[in-house]
Amino acid sequence: MKQPVIIAAKRIAFGKYGGRLRHLEPESLLEPLFNHFTDQYPKVMSLLDDVILGNTVGNGGNLARKSLLEAGLDFKIPGITIDRQCGSGLEAVIQACRMVQSGAGTIYIAGGVESTSRAPWKIKRPQSVYESEFPQFFERAPFAREGEDPSMIEAAENVAKKYHISRNEQDDFAYRSHQLASKNMNNGNISQEILPFKVKGEYFNQDESIKPQLTLRTLGRLKPLLNEGTVTVGNSCKKNDGAVLLIVMEENRARQLGFTEGIKFVNSATVGVQPQYLGVGPVPAVNQLLAQERLTINDINAVELNEAFSSQVIASQQQLNIPLNKLNCWGGAIATGHPYGASGAALVTRLFYMKHQFRTIATMGIGGGIGNAALFERWYGN
């Protein structure tokens, strides 16, 4: 098989729902990233085989195709959009790497985009053209069959109860996320990932959801979202707007084009779990991935596990025995935000910039009861 490597990765700063990016459609969120890659790597962008993007709550159609055309890329580049719910961005990266492995192509753009602020409303179609009742809006997308389809909050509570994750543990983890994100934004680690771009005349270059002044006392005052529950708005991720792009390339092609550093794709795993406990999807996915490569968690230097809810991250960490000092070391989605279709690609982007970590994993728990995980190693092409 051919060896895929990721030689470039960038994201925009993530906006909060209804925040500074609220007026921008998904295509507009992607445009500065496409433009940046075109300016930095014109030869690479002229040789693209395809653009593979994750998106979950967009307008429909083929967003990857529309976005690349809006950005002025060659019309001969096709484009495909993937929906594996919150795992879409990671799935896009995995699929690009698999295409390179198979020899189907040598250069791909992979990533994801989401605008929760611009997500369209959806209504049920009337059964009859003569129906006169007021249209019924969908509250959310269905993820599983009736009776086995909890809301995200219900699923997070299910995990908290099953794995005995207390309210204090969840709040402590959320506090850690904000503290680490704030620290690593200020010291420049997270800033490496972010491409600043102008929004209404001013540069947008910091994630809007990070709360450096947040205290445990404030978190403790928040009411649970469900009666007698432990999940709150404070120990959960926010709804966000954001976009991420990466360049995936065949190793020898990368060397020919002068690239000497990045991360190489090793393997991936995708596994189904009970929809009621969807948040622990990373557990079987990571276990399968490690077994495939005859590794243990001790062989992994850093793990990026999407922080949809504190409860599911803590449960996954405990079941996988991940040392806390290897988990989400720069903070996670509880602080920086969760633009659904982009989040998995953002995890890989973070690993790309953790240049002192050799062997790393990105993993997601996914609506409907799925976990996916991908293993990478630091790559030097010289």
From Swiss-Prot:
Gene responsible for this protein: vraB
Pfam family, one: Thiolase_N
Record GO biological process: fatty acid beta-oxidation; phenylacetate catabolic process
Active site: C86 (acyl-thioester intermediate), H338 (proton acceptor)
One MF term in the entry's GO annotations: acetyl-CoA C-acyltransferase activity
Origin superkingdom: Bacteria
InterPro entries reported in the protein's UniProt record: Thiolase, Thiolase-like, Thiolase-like_sf_Thiolase, Thiolase_C, Thiolase_CS, Thiolase_N
Listed GO CC annotations: cytoplasm
Keyword vocabulary terms for this entry: Acyltransferase, Transferase
Presence of keyword Protease: no
EC number of the protein: 2.3.1.-
Species of origin: Staphylococcus epidermidis (strain ATCC 12228 / FDA PCI 1200)
Name of this protein: Putative acetyl-CoA C-acetyltransferase VraB
Family indicated by similarity: Belongs to the thiolase-like superfamily. Thiolase family.
